[in-house]
Amino acid sequence: MVKTQRVVITPGEPAGIGPDLVVQLAQREWPVELVVCADATLLTNRAAMLGLPLTLRPYSPNSPAQPQTAGTLTLLPVALRAPVTAGQLAVENGHYVVETLARACDGCLNGEFAALITGPVHKGVINDAGIPFTGHTEFFEERSQAKKVVMMLATEELRVALATTHLPLRDIADAITPALLHEVIAILHHDLRTKFGIAEPRILVCGLNPHAGEGGHMGTEEIDTIIPVLNELRAQGMKLNGPLPADTLFQPKYLDNADAVLAMYHDQGLPVLKYQGFGRGVNITLGLPFIRTSVDHGTALELAGRGKADVGSFITALNLAIKMIVNTQ
């Protein structure tokens, strides 16, 4: 790395395991400065519950970034709206969570931070607080005014991007248009090159229907939409294989010759990835003007403050963000 960079972290729902995981992250050295956008008392209380040392250093944006030493975090303070009891949601803190996301996102947009890593949020409590919220991905897309973003989950062995994300099944076929596929594949191809350092990305594309439509006998979306788009993009030099039946695509003879898979919808691709590497996966938002990675699990309220939360996904998300920073320098 040419110089030390700052990475901003949002712990997510304060009553969940996010603060626990951030405290656990702090127990090792990191080659970047970890700036945590959170309430100071929340972090120190959670560290005490876990019996782990934690020193919070004030965030100084005008000073050079320093590698993080074990037992420390750099704090960018955002105040809680209500006291926190581990494992018990407080609707008032839905506003706090969104404030941390907004400040971290704005810091990435203005160049303060080289990447953003997000802990798990509780969408229900944010909406109960009167804030319409469907997820991190959509929030950052709107706030950064990105034209289009793509959700991708990854383990060490597999990357799966989604053409559509949080849609009911009955709406998916209508959502998969030529324009959408052009945009999604272009973003996936671009970010695999620029953020992952893959010179000529090889992308496997799932069909929408069983057996990828079986020549039109089980649906015509492949013939009408997916195949024409893939042919156009192949003519531009992209290495695309598909559409392939999703039930046979996820095997070594295909995956060994691919850098990523494009699934048509959420539950087509993600169950395979999560079965293979649950707790080791990373959620990546492609198409943003900054690097954003996230854990692949939820708030686990029942584990908060008990020292039983697995920090593996957070470590993987941070390590991947650091690699992506290096690739973009």
From Swiss-Prot:
GO terms for cellular component: cytoplasm. Its cofactor is Zn(2+); Mg(2+); Co(2+). It comes from Escherichia coli (strain K12). Binds 1 divalent metal cation per subunit. Can use ions such as Zn(2+), Mg(2+) or Co(2+). It comes from the Bacteria. Its EC number is 1.1.1.262. The active site is located at the dimer interface. According to PubMed:15026039, PdxA may catalyze both oxidation and decarboxylation reactions that directly lead to AHAP. The keyword Transmembrane does not apply. Pfam families: PdxA. This is 4-hydroxythreonine-4-phosphate dehydrogenase. It is found in: Cytoplasm.
